[in-house]
Amino acid sequence: MKRLLILVMMLCMVSSAMAQSGRLTAKIVDMETKEGVIGAIVELQSKSNPNLRKHNTTGAGGSVTITGLAAGDYSMKVMFIGYTPYTADVKVEGTTNLGVVELTPGVAIEAVVKEVQALRTSQNGDTVAYNAAAFKVAADADVEGLIKKMPGITVTNGQVEAQGEQVKKIFVDGKEFFGEDVSTALNSLPAQAVDRVEVFNKLSDNAEFSGMDDGEGYKAINIVTHSNMRQGVFGKMYAGYGYQPDIDGSPAELSFQNTNIYDPKVSNVTSHHKYNVGGNVNIFQGNHRVSVIGLLNNVNQQNFSFEDILGVTGGGGGGMGGGMGRGRGVGQYMVRPQSGVANVGSIGVQYTGAWGEKDAVKLNGSYFFNSTNTRNKSLLQKWYEAPSPDDYLEQEGESETHNMNHRLNLRFDWRINKNMSLMSRTNLSFQGNNPYSQQYGELTGETPGEGKYEILYNGSNGSSRAIRFSEFLQYRVNLGKVGRTITVDGRYALRNTLSSTTNSFSTLETDYAAKLPILRYVSSLAPQGETDISANLTYTEPISKSSQLSLQYRFDLEDQQIEKTAYITGEDYNITGLQPDASLSSLTNSLSMEHRVGPGYRYAKGKNTVVANVYYQHSILDGMVKGKNIKRDYDHVTYFLMTNFAFNPQNTVRVFINSYTHNPDVRNLQDIYDVSNAQYLSKGNPELRSSYNHRMNLHYVRSNIEKGRTFMWMFSAQLTQDYIGQSIEYNKKDINIDGNIYNPLQYSTYENMDGYYNLRTHISYGFPVSPIKCNLNLSAGVNWSRTPSMIDNQMNYTSNMGYDARMSLGSNISENIDFTIEWNGTFNDARQSLVKGNMRNARNQYFSHTASGQLKWVFWKGFTLTGAVNYNQYIGFTNNYNEDFLICNVYLGKKLFKNQQGEILVGVNDLLNQNKAFARTVGSGYTQNAWNSVIGRYFTVQFNYNLRHFGKKGSKSIDDYDGMGQKGGMPPFPGGRPPMMPR
């Protein structure tokens, strides 16, 4: 009897399991284009049990699979924004393949949103897709205004972060848009044209073809446009004039302003009269698209990043390497504007085209030019604290910089046949920079006016030019069997710079009675050349339907020559008859080579992927500094592991673990003093070893399809062995260099140190608040870092604990009312390990927060109210510091023309005249407050015009565009940008 019962139970269990083992597969495509629809929701409802529902979202190519289905009859519904919902009855028996399901375009967006709130977000592997219709913005908003409302995405001063990582590139319908300039791309498209926004991890060109992730990818955003807006002309244009009564937007002057040595030459950073003209036009004709963007203003509006190949802003330059011989990574040269007030002019053109059968030949290119003239008056207060000597520095400065950039990016793809393809990337950039600056400061004891006294002065005038060219060529072959591939690529890069500078700076000799430093005048010429050559060979071999092996070899060579010829002159900087000063002149040659080889393994099944690589790398450094040879060899083993796991269609986790090395360069290793600044001497360390870094990133995303909620968690950790840190000695006495005695304020060198850590975690949660028709995004994070250094031959650890929180409430009511309310705050607690117990300055605590609101309201008969309020506060708990200001911009406007595509506005920028540019920095042994120039209150009038002409899908004729072939009507007219609100 027992055996019979057990047998019956087993049969029941098997029967139940079989009943739930059914699966349904299908491919969802656009009826007209036959392209796969990614991110569509497919829902099955059991007819025998209506409470039983299962759903999934379509992946690559529109494919979808739903598993765990009991055999029986189901009602199927397929939904996606911009398409009529598809319904059908299906019968599931075992594995059921529906084949191709076609969606018909043309449903009203609101109808779909009302039907299923789930259309906020969807997931497919490591891609999170946001449906634009679920985040309503004003009719004339651009893409940047749209993505700010999406959970997990933040935009701060033009820098875009998604899921805790910086976004390096923007794609439009899968094609690169304006190269690496994310800011320009986001300001070139109207939000109305966007169907969805996809955040994904973009693989390198090599990894994308072979399928073997090599760890050189980056975070990117793909903007998918509405299918009925891919044929037409659209954009926005604007023109405005303003007047500023009070043009003194500089920080307060210090008490030593009238010193004889400091002679200000920048009278005003801005002018009474303001102008702001610009716009963008997009011409989409099937496979061929042209976008043009332009900007001209003197109100500091810079909706682009410029390419700093000279390294003049402190955000880049200084070398081609971000790793031995591999050149800079994506976006590494792109920096945001400098401090101050700028007159700006820019123009950019983007082109995308495809030809041949199945678009076998593709071309993507962009050209961008920008010119800025930036003026700034600055004020700096710096406290040197324990473990540094208790000194206090006050410094005042001014600068004027003319900067010019040209950059050209081209990508060419040729699919030779089904097994072979060729791809090339060409980048050409030119930069010109003419900087002028001078700073005057007084260094005193712990309390201003007491103790020791030094005068610091630095004046500089120069001219720099740089050109950068790179060519990347990749040949890819499928060897018949699926997964068996060979990829060969090579890269050549060239960078040449030439800088001519005159400097006057203070030495340690001071005429204390007259409060005048003894100045040294130097004229220098600094040419620099770099060449980078690399080659890569990757072979992949499938070992099963789900797994693949690879073998990769990579070679990198970097040749660098840096020369500086400097002359000590008189006040006229005349070098006639002078010999170069040996202590200030130098010639550095460096040749670096790296060989890297290693196997890899990839497993992929469904939406789950694991990639693992191990590399052996051998590096060689051969250099010469001031006639001294430097030779080093380094051998390392590095690793890479990436896994992407989908628990179900709503829960995915991605883990990224890798190691990498940083080899010291010849300047780190040189056993020669740098005496170019006698107050701050430095020297290399020939005993330096390579640093070895371990890094881990984890991303978890959960999307609640039914309730439209999105939760994200990010965790990252970094540990560095043999960290290359600074060793600083203060007031080091009697340093004998070539018979000259130096007594610098600070002497520094490099040392290998252990104990560098950086941990960060961040969560974000976004959900709709239905009663008030809004979307609420909440986020919070914690960051802890510990950086080792040596101070007066003692080990010091600078630990910083940072907490941040953010709240954003965005309207989702209609295009006639668009508002966002935001708050974000950060609290930092920095400590120095050399400062014990309750000693003064044992810890440095400060808090900053910002509360802001933006409103665009279209009300009675097309009148508009546009406003922005921003409150900033900085609180220093350690030194009882409090700085706050409130900025308020208000504009009243009126919509014009039949379709309200025009708008006239009048208003005021910075109504309360409180704008400030303030920054607080905490480092190893110091705290610094800095102020820079800003634009104050001004009154303005502006005209905007939104260009919208869309034609028949698939039409090749300009006459088919709505409104383009009509007689009369309103011609294109300037307008479109939001009112002049300086960033």
Describe the function of each predicted region:
Residues 522, 548-651, 835-842:
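Signature of Gram-negative outer-membrane beta-barrel scaffolds
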Residues 32-47, 121-123:
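Short, ordered, surface-exposed loop/turn motifs in non-cytosolic proteins
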Residues 396, 532-534, 578-586, 683, ...:
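Outer membrane beta-barrel strand-and-loop segments of large Gram-negative receptors
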Residues 126, 302-331, 375-394, 441-456, ...:
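Surface-exposed loop/turn segments flanking beta-strands in extracellular/periplasmic regions
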Residues 47-63:
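Short, acidic Ser/Thr/Gly-rich low-complexity loop/linker segments typical of extracellular
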Residues 48-51, 73, 77-89, 119:
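A short, solvent-exposed loop/turn motif at the edges and junctions
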Residues 13, 20, 61, 77, ...:
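Membrane-proximal, glycine/serine-rich, low-complexity loop/turn segments characteristic
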